[in-house]
Amino acid sequence: MLYQLLGVDLVAVEGLNEVTAQTILSEIGTDMSRWQDEKLFCSWLGLAPHNDISGGKVLRSRTLKTHNRAGQAFRLAAQAVSKTNTAYGAFFRRMRAMHGPMKAIVATAHKIARTVYFMLRDHTPFHDTSAEEYQQREREREIARLKKKATKLGFTLAPASA
């Protein structure tokens, strides 16, 4: 039924079920032109960091407190994907290892919210990637970053022979 209404299947997104998708839609509606871009959308949901800056120094960087039910639904979806073998699950576990569980939930919810925003705005279907593909991409990025840093310092990297 949601697919007929929206033209996209929100339930295909990992972590979103029928009830969560209905909660999100009842709060945000189907018209995504209310927000200029995904950053303003995530800020409205209370999932984007709010930087308090004074004199060029970031004093606090926390999400604003909000009682937005759609934001809460995205947080529930983020908790639901924590143990799945998907790209969102791998992202959650990586964030949890670096920043702890609370920040990982908000970061994953922010990522899911951006996906839903683009699905509803552009009417594009959800393309799921597995955790292995996600980890492979992250490994390639890390290797590229290390090579760039090594060349900047005057070194060359060579893969170890196994």
Feature names for model-found ranges:
Residues 1-162:
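A detector of single, family-specific signature residues
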